[in-house]
Amino acid sequence: LPDLVKAFGFPCINMAGFEADDVLCSLAVQFASEDVHAYLLTSDKDFSQVVGPNISILDEGKGGRRMGVSEVQDKLGVLPEQVVDLLALMGDSSDNIPGVPGVGPKTASTLLGQYGDLESVLGAAAEGLVKGKRGANLVEFAEDARLSKRLA
C-alpha cells in the first residue's frame, strides 16, 4: 500500500508505535489554521474528537458528507471535545475499549449532557446522584472507565 500511495504522489508517513488514526488526527490539528482547513476522510467516530472550526470529517460511509461540530453533535449527542469521554463510558468494540457495562451511546451522551465530562459523571455516581444499576456500575467500573478514556 505505501508504494501505491507514493505512486499517486501522496506522502506516506509511518510512525512506529502509533496507530494511523492518531497520526492523522495529530497532523490535522498541527496543520489546521485560519488559512488551512483540514478534511479527514473517514467513517471512524474516533476522529470526531478533533473536529472544530478548521477541521472537518468527510464521512465516507455517507457519500462524503461533511461533518463539522454541529453534525458531530447531531450524530453522537456530544460535542467533539466530549467524544473521548463518550467512548470511555460506552466503550468501542472496534478499538477494544471496554467502557462501563450497561452504558450505551444514549445513556453516555445523556450523562455527559448532564455532568459535562467523565470525571464529573463518575463523581456524581459516587455521590449517589446516578441511581440504580447504572450508578452502581459507574462506581464499580470507575477505574475501567478511566482506562477506557486513556485508550480512546
Each predicted region: which residue ranges?
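Extended two-metal-dependent nuclease catalytic cores across DNA- and RNA-processing enzymes
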Residues: 1-152
